[in-house]
Amino acid sequence: MQFDIEKYWLQEIPDSSLTSVIGEIPKRWGRMDPASRIAVVEIGLLLKQANLLAKNNLLNKEIKAGLITGSKLGSLVTDLAFSKTLEEGVDNASPILFGYTLPNIPLAEAACHYKIIGPVYSIISEKPLDCAIEEANFWLKNDSGISFIIAGELDITPDLENITHQVISAKFKIIKLNHA
């Protein structure tokens, strides 16, 4: 099953093709930034395809897992959108956008939604996916309680003229330690 990223990140109310993957609509969906919506859907799709979600579309509570993404741009799109709200003064600053001005927030949204308990963070790197996979392998080698880590790359480039955005990458993989 493949989704049109450009379509679902703009959906204020997810349609049935999305809810079949994400289950219950996250309470914060309406105020989520595009990167968070992408993370929730893409990570849910990956978990579903790997048969790692229970019937309630949550990760089995016995499984300890993690989420690590690499990014070249971090939360630049949201940072710029937030700064644009400051143009008319601090009283017009968007508290909703401010909450998404850290690059790990999309992962936190996905982790909360699917009840993922384990390391969850983002790394800024010129080789985002490679760096995330390297970090995932480090965790798996050093914490035997972790079943798997979803390593990914998530970057959205801003349109500086209009402060709009275009997805440039959204890739995720399940990384497991190979027991020889």
Describe every region a protein language model picked out.
Residues 1-180:
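Conserved "HGTGT" condensation-loop signature of ketosynthase/thiolase-family condensing enzymes
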